[in-house]
Amino acid sequence: MAQQQSSRLNRLLTLLDTGSTQATRLTAAKQIGDIAKSHPQDLSSLLRKVLHHLRSKKWDTRVAAAHAIGAIVLNVKHPSLSELLNSLATKLGEAGISDNVDEVVAFRNLQSKILANAPFRSFEMNKVLEFGALLASGGQEYDILNDNSKNPRDRVARQKKNLRRRLGLDMCEQFMDVNEMIRDEDLIEQKSNVPANGVGNRLYANCSPHHIQQFVSRMVPRVNSRRPSARELNLLKRKAKISSKDQAKGSCEVADVEMSSSHVASTSKRILSDSLDSSKADIGNEDDIEPDGDGKWPFHSFVEQLILDMFDPAWEIRHGSVMALREILMLHGGSAGVSTEEFSSDNGFELKDVLNKVTREREIDLNMQVSENELEPLRKRPKIEDPSKSFIDNTVLEVIGGDYDINVKDEDAEFLLPPVKVNGQTDCSSTKLEPQSSMDDSTSHSEINHVAEVNNHFEDKSFIEEPVIPKQQEENLEVLDLVKQARHSWIKNFEFLQDCTIRFLCVLSLDRFGDYISDQVVAPVREACAQALGATFKYMNPSLIYETLNILLQMQRRPEWEIRHGSLLGIKYLVAVRQEMLQDLLGYILPACKAGLEDSDDDVRAVAADALIPAAAAIVSLRGQTLLSIVMLLWDILLELDDLSPSTSSIMNLLAEIYSQDDMTLVMHEELSLGEEQNIELNEMGHIESIGERRDVKESPYALSGLAPRLWPFTRHDITSVRFSAIRTLERLLEAGCRKNISGQSKSSFWPSSILGDTLRIVFQNLLLESTEEILECSERVWRLLVQCPVDDLEDTAKFYMASWIELAATPYGSTLDATKMFWPVAPPRKSHFKAAAKMKAVKLENEASSILGFDYARSSASLEKQEDASARSTKIIVGSDMEMSVTRTRVVTASALGIFASRLREGSMQFVVDPLSSTLTSMSGVQRQVGSIVLISWFRETKCKAPSDGSGSLPGFPSPLKKWLLDLLACADPAFPTKDIFLPYAELSRTYTKMRNEASQLLHTVETCHCFDKLLSTNKLNVESVTADETIDFASTLDLWNKESAGNESLEKQVFEDVESSRQQLLSTAGYLKCVQSNLHITVTSLVAAAVVWMSEFPARLNPIILPLMASIKREQEQILQQIAAEALAELIAYCVDRKPSPNDKLIKNICSLTCMDPSETPQASIISSMDIVDDMDFLSSRSNTGKQKAKVVLASGEDRSKVEGFITRRGSELALKHLSLKFGGSLFDKLPKLWECLTEVLVPEIPSDQQKIDLKIESISDPQVLINNIQVVRSIAPVMEETLKPRLLSLLPCIFKCVRHSHVAVRLAASRCVMTMAKSMTTDVMAAVVESAIPMLGDLTCISGRQGAGMLIGLLVQGLGVELVPYSPLLVVPLLRCMSDVDSSVRQSVTRSFAALVPMLPLARGVPPPVGLSKDLSSNAEDAKFLEQLLDNSHIDDYKLCTELKVQLRRYQQEGINWLGFLKRFKLHGILCDDMGLGKTLQASAIVASDAAERRGSTDELDVFPSIIVCPSTLVGHWAFEIEKYIDLSLLSVLQYVGSAQDRVSLREQFNNHNVIITSYDVVRKDVDYLTQFSWNYCILDEGHIIKNAKSKITAAVKQLKAQHRLILSGTPIQNNIMELWSLFDFLMPGFLGTERQFQASYGKPLLAARDPKCSAKDAEAGVLAMEALHKQVMPFLLRRTKEEVLSDLPEKIIQDRYCDLSPVQLKLYEQFSGSSAKQEISSIIKVDGSADSGNADVAPTKASTHVFQALQYLLKLCSHPLLVLGDKVTEPVASDLAAMINGCSDIITELHKVQHSPKLVALQEILEECGIGSDASSSDGTLSVGQHRVLIFAQHKALLDIIEKDLFQAHMKSVTYMRLDGSVVPEKRFEIVKAFNSDPTIDVLLLTTHVGGLGLNLTSADTLVFMEHDWNPMRDHQAMDRAHRLGQKRVVNVHRLIMRGTLEEKVMSLQKFKVSVANTVINAENASMKTMNTDQLLDLFASAETSKKGGGSSKKGSEDNDQIAGTGKGMKAILGNLEELWDQSQYTEEYNLSQFLTKLNG
């Protein structure tokens, strides 16, 4: 079983690396976690295997491997420290001890003593950076093997070639000469001095990674409570060896600085390899990662290995290890070090001993005496006395006890404490912040003896105070033990966390790898390391938090930007994770982040801003000068940013976060009020400016007029994230101002008037140009906020900009926007040049690696001045060039915004809008009319919404002429003349009209010149100058008719007609296109004009001019957004007409309801959908929700597709109209519009209990099912938009709809099912209650197939449509579905199987959900089904199936489990394959379940019909079955009839059928008597050796599949013998359709597996094969039970298989060589390569290719291997006889000669084997003693002729003493069992000769213990079956199997083919099929759903690669160059992996 489990694990591990999608990889990772859960004993091995993938070069593989580690950790349970303390608290309470847990355990004392020895005290950043190798790329990809060539010229030539290859120049050789690019002198080594101004390559080249390992190990506690293991001792030896090498290398460097580069390379390479050996040595063998002891944290050893990998030179290995540590710490950070070992009170454990040992083992150099004051808890915060100084001289907090070459006096200790909180403010006055001027590398060791003094602290008796717990009572002793355990675990956890923290800090300091692929650098190692550090922060003691923060602050002072970047990453996760400590930490974090914000490096600035975002609320709470200085700093940074600054988005996000805080509103109000009374000097507020600079009051962060414009340049930034940040920041500023106004805190405008105009212009341009939906929606919200400003300010803006805005909005498609009317903001003035000079100085300092450290150097730098003249921008913006955004959507958004703006204006300023609107509406341009109409619609709609009381949206000052003009436009119904009294088309169509008229003129000219159409022209005159599209089409059509009439006139020239026809077709095309475009444009324009008239609420007397355009838009408008406008206006119009007489409403409602049925894809067509096959073929059962997200624009196609698209548009428009009607009328919808209810109840009748029969009659009496379907579709369309109060009324139609679910017509059933599904989405509780009560019983109605089909269809749609909302109902649906999975109807089976697959994963979720409301108690609490579901979810609770009868044998455990499984299948009417190994009792288990069922039925009074059972088996086994049943089962229960014999015998036996309840027959009999046997309905139909039906096309298979039975069971030890298609045939008998059709199965599984078998297959093919194999395994797993003898029979002797190789005899060799020269040789070779037709699984390949003689030749070869006479026969042809006579000297009779055994090496080998067994030799040995150890032998052959030869030539000639029997096909079946019984009962019979075919089926021959296979079958399972005749239950001796194989022949190929087939079979059916417990019945989804997923992922095609090969050709061309390019990096991979909110969600669980 372990081997099988390993096989599955290996496949999952392969998917981690080769999965085509990240989802595939993560799914594999999750399943690896499940393996860890089910096999906890293999944890160490599992981790080791995943560790390999953590070191992969591929990002996706490492991420998936880290997720796999997380999944493993999730499934490994270990108590955490908090759980341990909670249990201690409980015990203390039970013991009556009232002390606090902290006091009892003495944590405070523990903390103070441990901190005195904290490794942070000895952590020195300079030492880490000096001795640690910088970590960037490992550089191995650039290593070059040493060139030992003695000839310098050859060496240079080789290097030139290598360099050309690495530079890619070898690809260019065919295009240009590359020899001169690299010259010899370029490669000659030039000596140069080491650079004087930097470290050069010293840190990279000469430092082994183990320098840092050794250095860190001195600082980090390594607590070992045991003697070092052998692995650890070896590791120490390796470290010592490396250390000695490093020292030797160091001395060498001193002696010779100018050592050659080759020597340096070899040295560094040697060190690198050594370090890699040492770091990776721990994973060399499976046992290297030692399993941790019982009770200890199980990941300790694994984490040690990961920590080693953290310092690997290769960044990928560092990245993988840190990600794995992150996953472990997230989940088990609180469990690390926690021990569950028992600490008994007498085991000698004393805490002081542990602490002393800790101290001794640390080996820490302490450079100072630790005073008592410094051991106090760290809780105070520094007070900022002078903010200006504290933020400038912002230095590191020197936490107590650290010695960094600064002398700290005891009296200074009070200044070194963390800050305290004073009146809610951060008080930093007590902090001593002195700059550290130098950090040299010298470290004094003179005070090392202070270690002893510190040790004395641990000897302090007061420290080990025992709690006051009386020890007399036993329970108190238990408490005392628990206290000791808690102390020990606390110390271990504390030390582990600080160990990890130190190492994370080292990586953050040393890592230099950065990826510059995106706008902002991403440092994956540092980011992942910071996340891991964040995970430790969650569990870390506050004292450790301060220690860690101190080192992070040290890192912030370093000159290297990477270290500053890493420190701020750590701070970011600290702030995010420990929010509860934020107020205490803020005093330290703010100065560091402010310094980061002013850093010279932009990436540091970005991460500094990101770090403060989680602290925004805390920053605002500081108020005062601190808040002001931070906010002003952020605003000032915006001045310095340019287009390439990656920190832009982060800075603005932080600003937005700060301004969006609720407290910020109050702060702004207070500060502005204060600013009105006094002048504020900003420099006095703490923000220090450069020399000579001052700011005035308007730059206060609370007076935005001078600051907000700094956002303008970023609103149209090239980077999407920057644009969104800019507009989001603006929105938050406006929201803060609105809140201030609403709360009454301010009476003035919340937005400065001076910048309102510019702000509106900027936002309008965003609406005009933006294509990103998120930014566009934000811009709309900002616009609405801006128009809330005072009307006076808005009117000023309208005066200047409204006309230009309308003109911009109306710019036609393809035209350029007028840039002069747009606002290009001039960048605000930059800071002074002094800042630029400061930056240059800072950069110079950094380049020189200056030792002058501190925050001030970074602050003094700023970005260089870069003045940009915005007015010089000459960007051309073409409307429609951005294809991401619909031009129509842009027009609607901008025009609607202008309407909203206009609604705020007063009557006096209305002219600013009306004048430009008049010009657009009177224009000939359709686009301008659209824009003008939309402005009016938005304007009047806003006005009406503000004054809804009178229902009028009219404006008194709106000009009447404009209203009249709108009505005049509506009166123009002809699209060709859309303007009153003007006979011109729309301006947009003028070009197309010109083109059409030119073509018409050309055609007319051609017709006139040929004089063939003079008569036609005289009657049809065409005015080319003014012709319309309709007239043109009419003329061209008339010309076509005339042309056909004149075609018979032979005098007309053919060329003339061709010219005329060509011109005519071109003209028709142009005119048709013009007509279509013109019609669509006219519909759009007129519908918008009509909508504008509707919203004006001034209707004309006749409503037709308004109604017709609106309805036309509902039917044909392609743009959804315009259709929505028309639908809303139509609802408004209908509301107006409710009280109008006469009212058009009834007709309108009728038309709208009719239009909902126009979409054939949503409304089933009864004339088309006439059967379930059509439903399945056309995929109508996919849940296409008619209320989901619709396409924004639909492009019309042609033909059938065009009608579908038109139907879709019409339905979409009508549903939008219903939606707006519902919104308009609400609960009074049916009262105001009674016609709508009439349409809903046209056929469907509301529920009336007394009229149930009438309802049924009415529905069935409807002759036209389409009427019923249309009625149902109207209900479906209106259900989602119905107001809540009306839903009960709609629910009254449900009973009638459920009647339609079981309607006789399939289209009605489909429509009703879709309708119920749609209703369930909006009325889940009520509809699902009705489903459970009405639809579920339909599934069990065996009398109504249409009801079962409809119910299956309905549930399938519900599962797809409702998804997780179905969770509470899933327990009620699963069991009924399960019972229907074997329904006789294939469509029912298919639908319920899919539904069951989707429901099963919901069951675990349903366990914690209360039962759904609205159901009766009987329905919601079915005890029997509940118990089954519990077993399904938790298979450890499976009960043994109680047989209803007693067996005459004691069942073994595995046999009971087999009966449990059979009982499971029986209960739920499922069917399966019992495929235990041969000899495990399949017959017994099957007989037992049949007998139990018979007894159960006999005892049941309800069961009237007692059906017999039929057992079909090979004819040899008929008697065996009868014998077994009689042996184990009570004959009174099962009465057996053997239905075999001749036809006459069988006819006579039929009379006895009624007297027996078990019929045993053979496959041949079933084939012959199928007509008779199919008349019966059988209870059980059992197929023994069921693989006989593996060929789906055989007559036996066809006959067996016709048998009808309630329970179908297959017994087979080998369900897969040759190929995977055999499994399909077996399941087609069990559950037809379960694995799809044969073709679908072949595509899903057969082809991928066959492709993957090819050794040259691609990685994608290999992955597809793995996925297909895994999917098939899961699909069939619950229906296959497989146990092997090795797993379940521990007392079964082993089976030893020995292959004996023989060499061909001379005669055989001669015949073999003769064949090799024959013509059949080539064909045979090809067949062997494709594995023969049987194995390929593709019936179309080999059989058509291979001729009959080829198969005969194959048989010839196989027979020849066994014996020459098998191929020669008794008569040898003359040529062959003469050849053989020449070979054999003195041979006269060749036949007689060939009968000698030496001509068949196999006979010789057989003789040897028999003699070894003591058979055939003399009865006594030479010394007269009797031979012992007598064996009995089975000899198997494929052919009877070989058995004849063995009898005659071996036994009778040479081994006459052998006694034997024979069993082959010549023995009649009835006699075969007698021979078996005789052999088993008579030990004097030595040998039984059998053919594999006869002797391999079900026989029990355990009396034999030796088997000899003379020949071998292509099918390996036949040989295995034959072996298991002896190796089975009852065997007492070791079984020896001898396989005789001829070396170098076809037989060897047969044996290799057998291995592959066995591998496939074992993969599909493996150890997971061993029992119900291992089948993962809780994951039944995978078992069903995998069929569909594998169809998508399994059938990969090679076509793409083949096409590429053809295109690219071969050789060195473009294909070779492109082949070496990697795929572009997907930025989303970084975004997803390093998302802070996702990290926090996962961390907090």
UniProtKB/Swiss-Prot annotation:
Broad class of enzyme this protein falls into: hydrolase
PROSITE patterns referenced in this protein's UniProt entry, alphabetically: HELICASE_ATP_BIND_1, HELICASE_CTER
Principal location: nucleus
Gene Ontology cellular component annotations, sorted alphabetically: nucleus
Entry keywords, A to Z: ATP-binding, DNA-binding, Helicase, Hydrolase, Nucleotide-binding, Nucleus, Repeat
Motif range (DEAH box): 1584-1587
Record-level Gene Ontology MF annotations: ATP binding; ATP hydrolysis activity; DNA binding; helicase activity; TBP-class protein binding
Recorded superkingdom: Eukaryota
Subcellular location: Nucleus
InterPro entries from the UniProt entry: ARM-like, ARM-type_fold, Helicase_ATP-bd, Helicase_C-like, Mot1, Mot1_ATP-bd, Mot1_central_dom, P-loop_NTPase
Region (Disordered): 1990-2011
Domain Helicase ATP-binding: 1463-1633
Binding-site residues for ATP, renumbered to this chain: 1476-1483
Effect of gene knockout: Impaired in root growth and true leaf development.
Effect ascribed to mutating residue 932 to E: In rgd3-1; impaired in adventitious root formation at the restrictive temperature of 28 degrees Celsius. Impaired in shoot regeneration
Renumbered ranges of HEAT repeats: 3-40, 41-78, 584-621, 702-739, 1288-1325, 1367-1405
Similarity field: Belongs to the helicase family.
Cited function: Involved in meristem development. Acts as a positive regulator of the CUC-STM pathway in shoot apical meristem (SAM) neo-formation.
Name this protein carries in UniProt: TATA-binding protein-associated factor BTAF1
